[in-house]
Amino acid sequence: MREAIIKRAAKELKEGMYVNLGIGLPTLVANEVSGMNIVFQSENGLLGIGAYPLEGSVDADLINAGKETITVVPGASFFNSADSFAMIRGGHIDLAILGGMEVSQNGDLANWMIPKKLIKGMGGAMDLVHGAKKVIVIMEHCNKYGESKVKKECSLPLTGKGVVHQLITDLAVFEFSNNAMKLVELQEGVSLDQVKEKTEAEFEVRL
């Protein structure tokens, strides 16, 4: 399920892109890159993230924004958070791939808090959804109770309004434009009826 999401998201990466991967599921996309020159950025101050380290080669001083140990590629650079967010807010990130708790039919994103639950803060997502040239959200289509996370309107506090360009779930791929949500692709083995049944949001079919 998660593997299908990650592999599909990796297809959106293009040669020479500067890409920010959100915490959690999006970080796994870096492991799918092969033979392309993609520069991954992390908002804690790193440009040039590599794949996850192999056992026995972990450097505890190298971590991403989610505090996971990582590797770096030749030519990687390190800098402070002010410079990192200047890159993001200045429009220098070609693509941000973020996780999501809810996405609405007009491209609103909620991914930073659940009311009454302890959180560390909003992180860099609010800057990324407005600074990156393209925003892709990857997430499971339904929550653990089987309820759709693809909503008519988000019920959780918003990260950004109308900021999502593309949504990739374990069931389908959607694109957003002109305040409309369009189904453009089904995941392997998934039917249109399954997507309709599991989706609260209204969408156009553009298969």
Swiss-Prot record:
SUPFAM superfamilies for this protein: NagB/RpiA/CoA transferase-like
Example GO molecular function: succinyl-CoA:3-oxo-acid CoA-transferase activity
Active site: E43
Keywords: Transferase
Annotated InterPro entries: 3-oxoacid_CoA-transf_B, CoA_trans_fam_I, CoA_transf_AS, NagB/RpiA_transferase-like
Reactions the enzyme catalyzes: a 3-oxo acid + succinyl-CoA = a 3-oxoacyl-CoA + succinate
EC number: 2.8.3.5
Assembly mode: Heterodimer of a subunit A and a subunit B.
NCBIfam families, alphabetized: pcaJ_scoB_fam (TIGR02428)
The family this protein is said to belong to: Belongs to the 3-oxoacid CoA-transferase subunit B family.
Protein name, per record: Succinyl-CoA:3-ketoacid coenzyme A transferase subunit B
Source organism of this protein record: Helicobacter pylori (strain ATCC 700392 / 26695) (Campylobacter pylori)
